[in-house]
Amino acid sequence: MPTQEVKKHAVLPPIISRNDKEFLESMQRYIITETKRVGCNEEGPPDEYYTIYRNVFDKVIDYVNAYKSVLTSIKKEYDAFIETVKKGRRNAFYLHGKLKVLAAEPTALVYHQRRTIQLEAKMRIIDNNSKAIQLQIDQMKQLRMEYENTEVKLCASSKQLWKPIPGMTLQDSVNLDALNNHKQNLEDKCRKLKQDMSTMYVSAQKKADLDEEMIVLLKRRDIAENLNKDLRFRHQRLQVISHTLNSWMKQNMRIPFKDVLERIQQTKAIYGHAKVVDELFEDDPNKTKEAIVMLYYIERFHELISLGEYEKAACFAANSPKRILQNAGTMNKFKAIGKVRGKPLPLLLFFEAIFNTSQAFKRAINVDLTLEGIKCGLSEERLDLVTHWVTQAKLTFSEKVGDAICAYGEQHPYHKSKCLALAQIVYNECGLHKKAILCLCRQGQFHEAMEHIQQSKDINTDDLIQLITACPQIDLIRGLTEERNGKPPFLSFGLTVLHLFSVDMKKIGMKLLQEVSKAEKDVIEHLVMSDLFCSIEKWQELANICLQNGFKNLSNDIMSILRSQAGVSEISEDDTTNVMEHVFW
């Protein structure tokens, strides 16, 4: 066989084993699957391609043991080449950006130079304007100094030359006809004012003269009433005598005249018995007229109620003589009506009428009507009416009235401050100074509250403790525990803090301790030494509280101040020293 034929048969492709074929197919599937997963196209991105084929290369190296060292060297060179390519790309990108920056520098320099020229031009303009303004200011100052140094005297007539005439335009002020009309109007107004002064107003001397004249007339009236009473008594006595004589004449004078005279003398009316005189000689016409008027008011009131004229009925009740219709019965009538659709509440109309007319009477409206009226106004959301009644009407206040207003303020936070102010007025009128001070504190008016406490004599320490419990405000507690105008504080600082910690107001107590801890030691010493009500044991208890709540320095300061006092020593619990030993020896 020729040599060429032998070589031709020798280069036949080797037969691939089944395992190698499956391995190659799995690698091919892996490449396709990973390429689709990362979304690579045929042109890139290259980094994902490099990663996929690097993994395939690693698997091939692991699979082929015979060529592992050779393939590992090839892969190492392959990775080095790829890293060199990547580094070259990064350097190219960096150099490209740097090249752009270098190319843009001349343009930026030109822009900056142009902007510099513009700003310098603006600065020159501003400097010129500033110099001009400064020059004007200097000129004005010079003129003002010259004006102040020169005494200028103007005539009284020349003062009005530059002022416009009130009620006239500049054009009318130079028109003679308009000026004449304006003058005529002013003269008419002046004439009317003089007439009003003579008819509508009187001088204080005139009032004094009228008062004296009234006193004289009242004296005349008293004299005339006494004379009238005497004359009526005489008239009554003559009537009795006349009646007796007429009866005697009708009986044909069968009784002796002497007996008739005795019977006349025995009549009490002849001698003016007090009871007979009072019954017979009262002002009967006036009493009768007054009773008729009262009866008319009552009948008319019931008639208006039956007709549904509740507003008129309320006015009738308010204007009734001697307040005969301003009572609980009338209030119950209006309350029984209830609400009327499309109209104000009849009960509110009743209270509005009687409260608005209360100033016309000497006596104030009683407590029950006042309380019911305030409650009615608050239930109808008419705080404006309640405000007017409390400040202007003549009412009889009570503690329940103030409590009702405070409760309304708690239910309506928007009106709380106004309700507290009204309740304060009520409590002051009732003499309830504790509740009035609480209202001031809830309004944040702590300075006024301090003044009120200082003026009140019936407020003690327990009341102030209750006050800070009901209104735990730092400013209030600070005002109660600080000296005022050289006077000792109202409350002991130490006892106050201990009380706050005992009633679950730890936050307020912590704030007070925090403020004190920021002060100097001499201030703390003054606070401890000037506190006359807090004993040493209480201060030690307060120091322990400070230590438990993180105020170690304050606790140490308090204890050092206590130890520095003469005759004061700290005794531990384990010490067996007898405190009263010196007494028995």
Swiss-Prot record:
Gene3D superfamilies: 1.25.40.30. It holds the Pfam family Clathrin_H_link. Keywords: Coiled coil. Transmembrane segments: none annotated. The keyword Cell cycle does not apply. InterPro entries: ARM-type_fold (IPR016024), Clathrin_H-chain_linker (IPR012331), CLHC1 (IPR017212), TSNAXIP1_N (IPR032755). Residues 118-239 form a coiled coil. This is Clathrin heavy chain linker domain-containing protein 1.
